[in-house]
Amino acid sequence: MSTFIGQLVGFAAIVFLVWRYVVPPVRRMMAARQDTVRQQLADAATAAVRLTESTTAHSKAVEAAKAEAEQVVAEAKEEAKRITAQMQTQAGVEAERIKVQGSRQVELLRTQLTRQLRLELGHESVRQASELVRNHVSDPGQQAATVDRFLDELDAMAPAAAEVERPVAAKMRSASRRALGSLVDKFAGLAKGLDNAALSALASGLVSVAQLLQREVIVTRYLTVPAEDAAPRIRLLERLISGQVGNPALDILRAAVTERWSASSDLIDAIEHVSRQALLEVAQRDGQVDEVEDQLFRFSRILDAQPRLSILLGDYVVPAEGRVGLLRKVLDSAGSVNPIAVALLSQTVELLRGQPAEEAALLLAEVAVARRGEVVAQVSAAAELSDAQRTRVTEVLSRIYGHPVTVQLQTDPTLLGGLSIAVGDEVIDGTLSSRLTAAEAQLPD
């Protein structure tokens, strides 16, 4: 019995302990579990609602998408129709433009081809004409006939006499031309009382003064200042050159600074011109003027044919003495050259002032001819002229220019026929080569 009671007490103690310590946590756990389940049930209900809503929204979205797709397709069809119509219109315009442009291009190509054919035909015609002309003038008689025909045309020209002045005065203005004329008259008066030695000394003295004035630009400007009283200029001149030149040269120079000059360089040109006149006067007295003129013209043609020599003679880096030395070597190698021609050419090389040597030599030759009141005509022909043709050229040109004419003939086979005549700046070109060139120049581009 006691055992039973003991067991009952033990069971009661166990029940108490379970009730006291186990039941409350279990109860709390079960309550929490119930809350969790209730929350899960609520969440499940919410999810079900959301699922229903999303299903409904999805259905609506699908319907809206279908409607929008149908609208987009409809709009796309309309846009496609509009674009198709627009492209058809543009294609028509572009096709018309291409058609017009193509027509223009065809017309342009036709024009270019026509022009090219005309040009080729023109060149071929000129070439054939040139061959015919060359074959024709290969006969000396026919070539001479071209000269005669040109002279007939020249003879038929109205004989409007041209005014021919001193070559050195061609580039001067009126005041300097008058001063040059007075200075030449002054020299002519002095030269009558001078012998050849005095004239040579006069030329040398004037050249030395021209070189001085060429170096001393300020002095030259002062000596050419236009003023009524020339006494100060004369005094300055006398202080500069007194005792260095003879009295004739001093008289010429006094007269020169008394005159009015348009440019200071004209004074130097005038002094150089008078020095040349002095040497040419010597040549005329000795009966050598024709030889001097011929040699001067020959040398000018040599310089024209030898540009390297012309450049060396006009090289201002080299002192004048060196250039004159080169000139004398060239003249010595040529054989017998008139001493007066040598002196004139030497002075010209010494006093070159920016002018090419070949032009200065030609001007010197023209000065020599013009001293006798003659005009120099540079005549170019394909072959030598007969004596009768030379005489006729001289007569016709003398009648045209109203002055005696000296003809300087140059031969150039490339001219083919006819003549080219140059008097000063005036050129009369009647050569066959120039006419062929003119015919070719008139061809269309």
UniProtKB/Swiss-Prot annotation:
- What keywords are annotated for this sequence in UniProt? ATP synthesis, Cell membrane, CF(0), Hydrogen ion transport, Ion transport, Membrane, Multifunctional enzyme, Transmembrane, Transmembrane helix, Transport
Its placement in the membrane is given as: Single-pass membrane protein
- Keyword Membrane set for record: yes
Q: Where is this region: ATP synthase subunit delta?
A: 169-445
Membrane-traversing stretches? 4-24
Protein function: F(1)F(0) ATP synthase produces ATP from ADP in the presence of a proton or sodium gradient. F-type ATPases consist of two structural domains, F(1) containing the extramembraneous catalytic core and F(0) containing the membrane proton channel, linked together by a central stalk and a peripheral stalk. During catalysis, ATP synthesis in the catalytic domain of F(1) is coupled via a rotary mechanism of the central stalk subunits to proton translocation.
- According to UniProt, the name of this protein is ATP synthase subunit b-delta
